[in-house]
């Protein structure tokens, strides 16, 4: 079964575009924010210099370890003249950042790739694996630099396999993951890793990168990615797997903390969503520049000269 471009999709409209957390005890986003805010840094200014933010990912050089998020469906807003998915891809291209795209049909994904930003396609864990393989092949043919799967988007709130836009999700076993990884020559990303166990399985399956994430609180009472990062980094020591992270990165200071804790690069989502919907590409660029300034500031205060020399001993929590 291949995704039908005309498939009906439920969509809450522009008012529902901004993710809202429940604020209840099970809301992983609340625990994530609290954990990040309790991480403090020591100052190391003697011999400190203005840092170099350039970062290598999948053999390509980018201006910063801050990346775009894997948004989905933003082009469904009522204003047909505005294409947010393309707008943030254009921002990524202009700022030389790695772009990510989530669940989109092939036509829409092709339009995003036409912007010519360096883009990773993240695919849902469809129960029908033919959809996964088809979307991987399309990404290969149209110039994506990597592909991956939202391995954490399996369970729905009803305790059954989730259904997204009418498409059933399904489990991804280690055997499944190995088979899918072997079907592509592109670097493969497992997005939604929140344990050493899954990190090691992703590595065993041949993934070239993982995203340490709870997918904006999909799992109730989920641990913060920042909390999981150090153990995952230690477990993957000696491998060539890239470790990315996301969830609640609202500033360059937040980005700094995750980078120090073990991430090679981080994705920002909600921090750019409002500027994206209000001002398009220019709003995203403005926000990213602010985050770059904050990241550079904190790196300079702590004597970090580049994105390859973060020192976890700087943090106190």
Residue ranges of model-derived segments:
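Acidic (Asp/Glu)-rich catalytic clusters
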Residues: 57-61, 109-116, 137-143, 203-206
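An N-cap/entry alpha-helix motif that binds or orients negatively charged groups
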Residues: 1-62
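Short beta-alpha connecting loops at secondary-structure transitions
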Residues: 273-283
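Alpha/beta enzyme core
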Residues: 90, 94, 127-246, 252-274, ...
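Charged helix-capping and loop-helix junction motifs
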Residues: 82-86, 224-230, 283
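Active-site cofactor/substrate anionic-group-binding motifs, chiefly glycine-
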Residues: 57-105
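Charged C-terminal helix
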Residues: 293-317
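A gly/proline- and charged-residue-enriched helix-loop-helix capping module
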Residues: 89-129
């Amino acid at each position: 079964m291949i995704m039908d471009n005309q498939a009906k999709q439920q969509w809450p409209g522009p008012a529902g575009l901004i993710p809202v957390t429940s604020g209840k005890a099970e809301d992983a986003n609340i625990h994530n924010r609290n954990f990040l805010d309790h991480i403090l840094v020591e100052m190391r200014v003697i011999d400190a210099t203005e840092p170099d933010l350039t970062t290598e990912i999948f053999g390509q050089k980018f201006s910063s370890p801050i990346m775009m998020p894997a948004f989905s469906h933003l082009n469904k807003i009522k204003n047909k003249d505005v294409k947010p998915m393309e707008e943030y891809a254009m921002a990524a291209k202009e700022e030389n950042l790695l772009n990510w795209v989530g669940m989109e049909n092939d036509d829409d994904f092709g339009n995003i790739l036409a912007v010519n930003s360096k883009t990773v396609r993240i695919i849902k864990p469809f129960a029908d694996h033919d959809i996964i393989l088809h979307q991987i092949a399309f990404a290969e043919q149209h110039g994506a630099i990597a592909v991956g799967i939202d391995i954490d988007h399996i369970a729905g709130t009803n305790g059954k396999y989730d259904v997204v836009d009418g498409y059933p999700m399904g489990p991804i076993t280690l055997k499944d993951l190995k088979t899918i990884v072997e079907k592509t020559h592109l670097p493969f990303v497992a997005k939604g890793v929140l344990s050493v166990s899954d990190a090691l399985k992703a590595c065993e399956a041949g993934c070239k990168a993982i995203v340490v994430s709870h997918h904006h609180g999909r799992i109730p009472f989920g641990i913060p990615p920042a909390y999981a990062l150090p153990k995952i980094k230690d477990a993957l020591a000696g491998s060539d797997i890239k470790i990315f992270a996301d969830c609640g990165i609202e500033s360059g200071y937040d980005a700094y903390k995750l980078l120090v804790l073990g991430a090679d690069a981080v994705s920002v989502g909600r921090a750019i969503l409002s500027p994206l919907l209000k001002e398009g590409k220019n709003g995203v660029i403005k926000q990213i520049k602010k985050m770059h300034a904050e990241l550079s500031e904190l790196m300079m205060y702590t004597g970090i000269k580049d994105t390859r020399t973060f020192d976890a001993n700087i943090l106190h929590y």
